[in-house]
Amino acid sequence: MALLRGVFVVAAKRTPFGAYGGLLKDFTATDLSEFAAKAALSAGKVSPETVDSVIMGNVLQSSSDAIYLARHVGLRVGIPKETPALTINRLCGSGFQSIVNGCQEICVKEAEVVLCGGTESMSQAPYCVRTVRFGTKLGSDIKLEDSLWVSLTDQHVQLPIAMTAENLAVKHKISREECDKYALQSQQRWKAANDAGYFNDEMAPIEVKTKKGKQTMQVDEHARPQTTLEQLQKLPPVFKKDGTVTAGNASGIADGAGAVIIASEDAVKKHNFTPLARIVGYFVSGCDPSIMGIGPVPAISGALKKAGLSLKDMDLVEVNEAFAPQYLAVERSLDLDISKTNVNGGAIALGHPLGGSGSRITAHLVHELRRRGGKYAVGSACIGGGQGIAVIIQSTA
């Protein structure tokens, strides 16, 4: 076994994902985490008093209280004030990283039960004004900086993140048509799964205010199931003339959160938890920042090697859909079986709230693996700046 101790998922929940400026825009990332965490504690019958550690992933600290995020989540859901909390940032891998950190704490016996999670309110990313703190001269041309937009450029390689996907399209000879067809597949798979109720077990509904009054939100808002290939083909490339990346085949800017509670084998027995899955192993890898989207390839390969498993052993595979050409490059590099990869759609359909996607993918794999009667699954994400992360789980059903 890749881990030093048995570590089990005893609850896994996520909020519905809201569209940019949509139904969740007035909730902070902390609020969204609170919803997911409360749902996970309830679903797993986990008393807040039994939680030894809180670890939350978050990328854009977009609210005024964001620096306290993990701590406030723990306190809000009733976890004792003596229990420590940690907010982490491994960009798009932050939700996965919270689980990695939690496993590490359990393996070295610093904790027995850990509330992990990831969250993002991209809608609340502020505009900022730099250089004014210490005074400005008369006539200064003060610029507003969009903190969300500028963060989507890797300044080290001077490339918008989407251009790293364009680089992969060139390298792997991926066409615009292939990207649009894949985007359509993501939307269609999401619709089929949503219509069949496959997301129900992972979903933590939220009460939201609308023009019609308060309503319960329990469906991802960003998805566009009515999308057609013809509509996708009409969209202009955004970052490169004759490029492949469009608004229709890239992941959606979104708001949302997930929570995954993990526990040691000893804690499962002591508290009579119902284990949903075992954490088999994980791996984090670096890669060339100019093709950062290829990160899941070394990450998945490394995780499988550590666990003594192969892709053929996996019943489900999830690769976060940052961009269609990025996903397709990973698919080709690993020779993925499309019948068991991103089976219910991905971030192109339902959105990618940066810190929240790893938790969403993990929660989905936990429940989907059980629903299908499968054994192993691997979830992964590329990471801005040139990294990849992967986590392997085994169903206990």
UniProtKB/Swiss-Prot annotation:
Residues given in the record as CoA binding sites:
224, 227, 251
Q: Which residues carry this modification: Phosphothreonine?
A: 119, 136
Q: Spell out which residues are annotated as carrying N6-acetyllysine.
A: 25, 137, 143, 171, 191, 209, 234, 241, 269-270, 305, 312, 340, 375
Transit pept. (range): 1-16
Give the location in the cell: Mitochondrion
Q: Can you supply one Gene Ontology CC term for this chain's record? A: mitochondrion
Site feature location: Increases nucleophilicity of active site Cys: 352
- Pathway annotation: Lipid metabolism; fatty acid beta-oxidation
Q: What is its main location?
A: mitochondrion
The protein's job, in short, is: In the production of energy from fats, this is one of the enzymes that catalyzes the last step of the mitochondrial beta-oxidation pathway, an aerobic process breaking down fatty acids into acetyl-CoA. Using free coenzyme A/CoA, catalyzes the thiolytic cleavage of medium- to long-chain unbranched 3-oxoacyl-CoAs into acetyl-CoA and a fatty acyl-CoA shortened by two carbon atoms. Also catalyzes the condensation of two acetyl-CoA molecules into acetoacetyl-CoA and could be involved in the production of ketone bodies. Also displays hydrolase activity on various fatty acyl-CoAs.
Task: Write down the NCBIfam families for this protein, in alphabetical order.
Answer: AcCoA-C-Actrans
- How does it associate, per the subunit comment? Homotetramer. Interacts with BNIP3.
Name of the molecule in the record: 3-ketoacyl-CoA thiolase, mitochondrial
Organism of origin: Pongo abelii (Sumatran orangutan)
